Regions:
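A cyclin-like helical interaction fold
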Residues: 40, 55, 61-129, 133, ...
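Extended, low-complexity, acidic/proline- and Ser/Thr-rich intrinsically disordered regions
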Residues: 1-4, 10, 102
């Protein structure tokens, strides 16, 4: 494969085994989310679809018909991802999911992502400045795991999300108030 990449004068795309893995992830993890009755699960499915290597190859007519049958909010998110529209509210949700996805510890925690979408919508409804997603995400993650077997210390959260203890404490108080 590396030899082919070196001698090829055109972009050969992803390796066959990468595409096969993407197809498997799509069928086992993403498709059930896209078909879920809950809009938050479908949004998360759209997010994961956008993260896949070789997603263009997986976009069959059947998948497009599923995407076309989604509600306007979900289609707006899809348009935001594909065309790069500036949509502050969806951008806030998306930036939070991206940050979670970049951290291996959180990457496969479906309930965390679904709960983030719900929490982000609650934060958005409070009409606060959405520029600093990390502070809201840090407070949310701390609260999310606080009462589980995976509780994280504030120090771990501060290190993972690069926020100050002051901002974390202040944002936890804010989230508890809504």
């Amino acid at each position: 494969w590396n030899k082919l990449l070196q001698i090829s004068k055109v972009d050969v795309g992803y390796a066959p085994w990468v595409l096969e893995e993407s197809k498997s992830v799509f069928n086992q993890r993403i498709l059930p989310l896209l078909l879920d009755d809950d809009s938050h699960y479908r949004l998360y499915g759209i997010f994961l679809l956008n993260q896949l290597n070789g997603k263009e190859i997986l976009m069959t007519e059947e998948i497009w018909s599923i995407l076309e049958s989604m509600n306007d909010y979900e289609k707006l998110y899809l348009t935001y991802l594909v065309q790069g529209l500036t949509l502050n509210k969806l951008d806030f949700i998306h930036r939070g999911m991206l940050k979670l996805y970049e951290i291996d510890y959180f990457k496969n925690d479906t309930s965390l992502f679904i709960d983030w979408i719900d929490q982000a919508e609650a934060v958005i409804s409070e009409k606060v400045d959405l520029a600093e997603v990390d502070r809201y995400l840090a407070a949310f993650v701390y609260m999310h795991y606080k009462h589980t077997n995976h509780a994280m210390t504030k120090k771990q959260i501060i290190d993972s999300f690069e926020v100050t203890r002051y901002k974390l404490d202040k944002t936890i108080a804010f989230i508890l108030s809504i």
